[in-house]
């Protein structure tokens, strides 16, 4: 059973009384601007809550920056339930929707006139206390932008506690998102009757922009190379044409840096033992050249579904053009899957793996392929299927070990983020007050728990 949060963590460091939810007088208002996609913004929000607690500041509901890549103009309230966010953090960090008029009048109601601080990446607690706090006390309000990765992973336990509460209790998806997500989960369970309602989710990063960014080639010859060059220039300007930038698609592939194709994912899963009765939810944006690349995966796994195939056009219409809202649907359906398969790095799989570890006490089945090894195996045209299956079984065993691993003694760093490895630091929040009786953005779990076996003898 998880240990309760120490009394000193709550009372001494936050100066609060949970009976009255009273906090000590604040040192000012904190405004942050979160950039990136859904989970980079999620990271920024959790870090903002932690920084506000550290500085004893009032946090203004974070603003979301519009990015040319993500093309999503959503505000905080479009993605998350603002009321739930505010009430869940009551007594820990005060949250407001706007800076009060008496302060904004000093800056002619112009947010850009508020003192702006450019905080270094992975800033320490000492940095915030020495460099940021004095400015906040002097002006009563500060703005930090950008705010991606602006707080070190290694912080005192009472700051980690705030990250845990923000991530797993306070951030609940908005009603439109959670309502449709619940329908999608129900439909996946219904379509997975052959496996007792259990399904596999695959996060497939084979969208056009991801293929372009990876600088990898996929048998498309000169036409594909020219197409990718145009996309890179349009989206990232001259980033890939700098003199010090050497593009080596062959080395990228051997080093496991290329996104796996749908065919490669299918071969891997069949080799691991997932048969053609397995229901698969594909969490992805629009696949690059879908007619060409999705067909092999569909043939190997006829029970292949996406949010587009599970929802009606009318249900998806309010989400079209909003990549973060679409990603939130994928996140929730993947969160409740029996097995989660990640095929590329990024914030989505790291946050999702952490969330599943938190929900299921560290025991969440995950497939994390050894991509350099997988590439070598797939390139061996003389390898027999039985040999390939044996190698995939070994890879699956290693993935399962990593998936259920709960590091007890470890040094927290960027690679062992609390968002990916939330235990044991976040374990105690199960014992906080009744304010936290539900799990925020989690739907009713019902019988969905990563325990039963979906793997059988695969036959191609």
From Swiss-Prot:
Glycosylated position list: 7, 110, 276-277, 435
GO MF annotations, alphabetized: glycosyltransferase activity
Record pathway: Glycan metabolism
InterPro entries per UniProt: FucosylTrfase_pln, GDP-Fuc_O-FucTrfase
Gene Ontology BP term (one): fucose metabolic process
Enzyme Commission identifier(s): 2.4.1.-
Pfam families documented for this protein: O-FucT
Record-linked CDD domains: O-FucT_plant
Source species, domain of life: Eukaryota
Entry keywords, A to Z: Carbohydrate metabolism, Fucose metabolism, Glycoprotein, Glycosyltransferase, Transferase
UniProt: substrate binding residues: 203-205
Family: Belongs to the glycosyltransferase GT106 family.
Protein name: O-fucosyltransferase 10
């Amino acid at each position: 059973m998880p240990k309760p949060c120490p009394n000193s963590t709550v009372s001494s460091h936050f100066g609060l009384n949970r009976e009255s939810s009273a906090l000590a007088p604040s040192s000012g208002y904190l405004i942050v601007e979160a950039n990136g996609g859904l989970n980079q913004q999620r990271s920024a929000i959790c870090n903002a809550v932690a920084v506000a607690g550290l500085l004893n500041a009032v946090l203004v509901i974070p603003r979301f920056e519009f990015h040319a890549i993500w093309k999503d103009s959503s505000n905080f309230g479009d993605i998350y339930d603002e009321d739930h966010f505010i009430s869940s953090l009551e007594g820990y960090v005060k949250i407001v929707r706007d800076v009060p008029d008496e302060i904004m009048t000093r800056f002619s109601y112009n947010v850009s006139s508020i003192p702006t601080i450019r905080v270094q990446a992975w800033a320490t607690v000492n940095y915030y206390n020495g460099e940021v706090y004095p400015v906040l006390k002097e002006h009563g309000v500060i703005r930090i932008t950008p705010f991606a990765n602006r707080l070190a992973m290694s912080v005192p336990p009472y700051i980690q506690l705030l990250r845990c509460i923000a991530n797993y209790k306070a951030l609940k998806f908005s009603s439109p998102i959670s309502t449709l997500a619940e329908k999608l989960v129900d439909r996946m369970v219904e379509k997975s009757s052959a496996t007792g309602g259990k399904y596999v989710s695959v996060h497939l990063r084979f969208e056009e922009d991801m293929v372009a960014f990876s600088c990898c080639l996929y048998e498309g010859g000169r036409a594909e190379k020219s197409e990718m060059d145009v996309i890179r220039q349009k989206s990232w300007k001259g980033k890939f044409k700098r003199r010090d930038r050497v593009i080596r698609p062959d080395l990228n592939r051997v080093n496991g840096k290329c996104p796996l194709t749908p065919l490669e994912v299918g071969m891997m899963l069949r080799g691991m033992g997932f048969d053609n009765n397995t229901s698969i939810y594909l969490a992805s944006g629009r696949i690059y050249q879908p007619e060409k690349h999705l067909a092999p995966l569909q043939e190997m796994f006829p029970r292949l579904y996406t949010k587009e195939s599970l929802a009606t056009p009318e249900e998806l219409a309010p989400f079209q053009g909003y990549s973060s809202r679409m990603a939130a649907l994928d996140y929730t359906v993947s969160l409740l899957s029996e097995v989660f398969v990640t095929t590329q790095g990024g914030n989505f799989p790291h946050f999702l793996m952490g969330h599943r570890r938190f929900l299921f006490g560290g025991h969440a089945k995950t497939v994390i392929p050894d991509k350099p090894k997988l590439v070598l195996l797939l390139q061996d045209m003389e390898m027999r299927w039985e040999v390939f299956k044996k190698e995939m079984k070994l890879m699956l065993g290693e993935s399962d070990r990593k998936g259920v691993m709960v590091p007890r003694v470890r040094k927290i760093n960027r690679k062992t983020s609390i968002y990916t490895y939330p235990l044991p630091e976040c374990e105690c929040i199960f014992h906080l007050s009744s304010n936290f009786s539900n799990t925020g953005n989690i739907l009713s779990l019902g019988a969905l728990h990563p325990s039963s076996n979906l793997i059988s003898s695969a036959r191609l």
